[in-house]
From Swiss-Prot:
Phenotype when changing residue 151 to D: In FECD4; interferes with post-translational processing; the mutant protein localizes to the cytoplasm
Record's protein name: Solute carrier family 4 member 11
Subunit and partners: Homodimer.
Organism: Homo sapiens (Human)
Clinical note on disease: Corneal dystrophy and perceptive deafness: An ocular disease characterized by the association of corneal clouding with progressive perceptive hearing loss.
Length: 875
């Protein structure tokens, strides 16, 4: 059986698409002309009892193109002889046309369509049907019962048949293929991505007297085939074929499809409860679309669409004149963020879209994610500084710095934390003070003051613009370096536990104690004879095999510590991924995922503290400070020592500058859909002010933490799922940009000072090490460097269809990966060196990656391939 089938794709470029990629498909992003397609009307007269088939869509590659899919199929029956010879094969003819989004500002018909249809549109909320047939039948019955829809000559069965096209042999059963649909699709350099949560179906019929619209919202996402795996909304547009060009079914469908193409708008519709709220959301969306002056709605557009949204990356490298206006960036940041400051406290608390539950779970997550590393690094600083900076001071500094940043920062989603590189720097300062007989508190304070001075200069001269030179590949190297430091800290801590308990040190202490007891007994009197003395020696100096209890205790401690660490990692990561599982209710899955870290920490802390009481576990050291807020005597240092501190402060400022801006850039990434703007320069100045106070009082420094800040954004995000090639992908709809979560977490961290030493000492060190592994593992998601390293271990047939694999020769990919690994090893060699003075210059190695990327790598790999591999990948 043969069939003449036509499938029409309407393409529409994104609003921010400069030019198309060099792949030969398109050369620019201007609008393309299209012809009106009216041939589908003739099918009404030839409908019969045909079967149906499915068709696969074509893949279109290009940069930042969004297009609609309009499927229109026509059937011509053939004889059974052709069917027998063809073996049931059908022919599918595919063509593409461009369909622009409706411009609500310029096209008056868009307003009239929406206002007219809202008065009589049929809205079906919470539809429980699972099949497409049942959903459409429910919508048609609702349409027929509506008194405003007077269509006496309309045959619902014929109308139902008009919605589908048969494309198969009758004896093989019916597989429905919709005749005419519109579906939102975005095509970028990384491939094609369908908006699978909505589907607009078009039908024309001569018996209809006027146009009608029916919208159905499904209770649960339904899988209706390829590229329609998560459908929540169905828009049905019915119209007679003979209409003015501005009133056709296609124009009406284009109006509603334009509105539903906004992911934030679809989320609002999911939150409505009544038909009136549903229609109010439609009117509100029309008003937002009207306020947009040029082109379609940007993906970030939300309720406050008039907010100026600075770009995540500057399209061109900064010029010298960009750094000249003193304090210009700070003034612009304050002007951008200050008008929205009250909303940072009221969003999610006041209004319709409340998110109190999400705020509570996110606050608990941040509390544990900040407190436990603070305890771990505080314990490390206590060992490295001989108690000058201990756990108590580290918790106090974390609470104070976090509170100030949560209250006054321009981007409160960024989380400040003391980190492993800072602990390395503090250790270097202690070594220098011991070598040159300097007062640690004074030298530490001067180093921090110089660091803050340089950070303030960077902020006033707008040096954050330099971060636009950091490519994705450079960011991935630094991010992976941070993850490696977490893993290394966990491994080193576990090795220390095994060295202390599993191997000979525990027994050495045991023998020492027994020997001292023997000496004391031998001095009791000379009346003991030689045989008794020999017996005592033999008893107390027994071999290790004769001390089963002692040996068992030490080995049990080491093995249990390893199991506790791995168990914390396993439980935390399993719960973190639990929201992707099919078990339990979606709300329960989301809560378990948000509270994964607290649950894992509390569970294994209780297991180690109460389940194995007889086994000694390694705990962090706590020595309460008599005066934790004593100010350093900065005047006691000589001018030469102050000058030396300036050099250390400059190198430290490089680390702060890179970490702060890099993490802030990851938080403000376009895929996170933040709407309140950025404040790179002001946040850098605020960071300098905060660390000035911490330096004077001998508290540990803090800066933006990775991956805590991106995880904070993720915890506050509403996501929409889509299914492609059997994999579930999440797209962020919006993020609750609030100060309450980081503010609450900082308050809880400060109150934790009251929990020292008990019950915080119930948290053993292996749980802290498990936390480090959890943070390192979760930070690897989406890291292309890790994915490309994994390609070396896979056979070529198992390579994923990513954009760089399709567009870059395989050898070039491996060359680029190898060069990245070499840079990572160089960074690790300096940052993790056993020589203290080598650790000081690893921030310069980070800066050196900029000329390596722009000067050295293009000499080895073509620039066009480098640009592809540095592009964002969205599956």
């Amino acid at each position: 059986m043969a069939a003449a089938t036509r499938r029409v794709f309407h393409l529409q470029p994104c609003e921010n698409s400069p030019t198309m990629s060099q792949n030969g498909y398109f050369e620019d992003s201007s609008y393309y002309k299209c012809d009106t397609d009216d041939t589908f009307e003739a099918r009404e007269e030839i409908l019969g009892d045909e079967a149906f088939d499915t068709a696969n869509s074509s893949i279109v590659s290009g940069e930042s193109i969004r297009f609609f899919v309009n499927v229109n199929l026509e059937m011509q029956a053939t004889n059974t002889e052709n069917e027998a010879t063809s073996g049931g094969c059908v022919l599918l003819h595919t063509s593409r046309k461009y369909l622009k989004l409706k411009n609500f500002k310029e096209e008056i018909r868009a307003h009239r369509d929406l206002d007219g249809f809202l008065a009589q549109a049929s809205i079906v909320l919470n539809e429980t049907a699972t099949s497409l047939d049942n959903v459409l039948r429910t919508m048609l019955r609702r349409f027929a019962r509506d008194p405003d829809n007077n269509e006496p000559n309309c045959n619902l069965d014929l109308l139902m048949a008009m919605l589908f096209t048969d494309a198969g042999a009758p004896m093989r059963g019916k597989v429905h293929l919709l005749s005419d649909t519109i579906q939102g699709v975005t095509a970028t350099v990384t491939g094609v991505r369908y908006q699978q949560s909505w589907l607009c179906i078009i039908c024309t019929m001569k018996a209809l007297q006027k146009r009608h619209v029916c919208i159905s919202r499904l209770v649960r996402p339904q899988n209706w085939g390829e590229n329609s795996c998560e459908v929540r909304f169905v828009i049905l547009v019915l119209a007679p074929p003979k209409m003015k060009s501005t009133k056709t079914a296609m124009e009406v469908a284009r109006t509603f499809a334009t509105m539903f193409s906004d992911i934030a708008f679809r989320q609002k519709l999911l939150e409505t409860r009544t038909e009136e709220e549903f229609k109010e959301a439609l009117v509100h969306q029309r008003q937002l679309l009207t306020m947009v002056s040029h082109g379609p709605v940007a993906p970030r557009t939300k309720e406050r669409s008039t907010v100026s949204l600075p770009a995540h990356r500057h399209p061109e490298p900064p010029k010298c004149k960009d750094f000249v206006p003193f304090g210009k960036g700070i003034r612009e940041d304050i002007a951008r963020r200050f008008p929205l400051y009250p909303l940072d406290f009221t969003d999610g608390i006041i209004g319709k879209n409340k998110a109190v539950g999400k705020y509570i779970t996110t606050t608990l997550f941040l509390y544990f994610a900040c407190l436990l590393p603070t305890i771990a690094f505080g314990s490390l600083n206590d060992e490295n500084t001989d108690g000058a900076i201990d756990v108590q001071k580290t918790i106090a500094g974390q609470s104070i710095g976090g509170l100030l940043y949560a209250l006054f920062s321009g981007q409160p989603l960024v989380i400040l934390l003391t980190t492993a590189p800072l602990a390395l720097y503090i250790q270097v300062i202690r070594v220098i003070c011991d070598d040159y007989d300097l007062d640690f508190n004074s030298f530490y304070a001067w180093t921090g003051l110089w660091n803050s001075f340089f950070l303030a200069l960077y902020a006033f001269f707008n040096l954050s613009l330099v971060m636009s030179l950091f490519k994705r590949s450079t960011e991935e190297i630094i991010a992976l370096f941070i993850s490696i430091t977490f893993v290394l800290d966990a491994v080193k801590g576990t090795v220390k536990i095994f060295w202390k308990y599993y191997y000979g040190h525990y027994l050495d202490d045991y023998h020492t104690k027994r020997t001292s007891s023997l000496v004391s007994l031998s001095g009791l009197g000379a009346s003991l004879n030689a045989s008794l003395h020999t017996a005592l020696n033999a008893s107390f100096l027994a071999s290790p095999t004769e001390l089963p209890s002692a040996t068992h205790s030490g080995q049990a401690t080491a093995v249990l510590s390893l199991l506790i660490m791995l168990g914390t990692l396993w439980l935390g990561y399993t719960l973190y991924q639990f929201k992707k599982s099919p078990y339990l209710h979606p709300c329960v899955r989301e809560i378990l995922s948000d509270c994964a870290l607290p649950i894992a920490v509390l569970a294994f802390s209780l297991i180690s503290s109460h389940g194995f009481r007889e086994i000694e576990m390694s705990k962090f050291r706590y020595n309460p400070s008599e005066s934790p807020f004593a100010m350093a005597q900065i005047q006691s240092l000589s001018l030469r020592a102050v000058s030396g501190a300036m050099g250390l402060g400059f190198l430290l400022s490089m680390l702060f500058f890179i970490e702060q801006n890099l993490v802030a850039a990851l938080v403000n990434a376009p895929e996170n859909r933040l709407v309140k703007g950025t404040a790179y320069h002001w946040d850098l100045l605020l960071l300098a002010i905060i660390n000035t106070g911490l330096s004077l009082f001998g508290l540990p420094w803090i800066h933006a933490a990775y991956p805590h800040s991106p995880l904070h954004v993720r915890a506050l995000a509403l996501v929409e799922e889509r299914v492609e090639n059997g994999h579930i992908y999440d797209t962020i709809v919006n993020v609750k940009e609030t100060r309450l979560t980081s503010l609450g977490a900082s308050v809880l961290v400060g109150l934790s000072l009251l929990l020292l030493p008990v019950p915080l000492q119930w948290i053993p060190k292996p749980v802290l090490y498990g936390l480090f592994l959890y943070i390192a593992l979760t930070s690897l998601d989406g890291n292309q460097l890790v994915q490309r390293v994994a390609l070396l271990l896979k056979e070529q047939t198992a390579y994923p269809p990513t954009h760089y694999i399709r567009r870059v020769p395989q050898r070039k990919i491996h060359y680029f990966t190898g060069l990245q690994v070499l840079q990572l090893l160089l960074l690790c060699a300096f940052g993790m060196s056993s020589l203290p003075y080598m650790k000081m210059i690893f921030p310069l190695i980070m800066i050196a990656m900029i000329p390596i990327r722009y000067i050295l790598l293009p000499r080895i790999i073509e620039a066009k391939y480098l640009d592809v591999m540095d592009a964002e990948h969205r599956p």
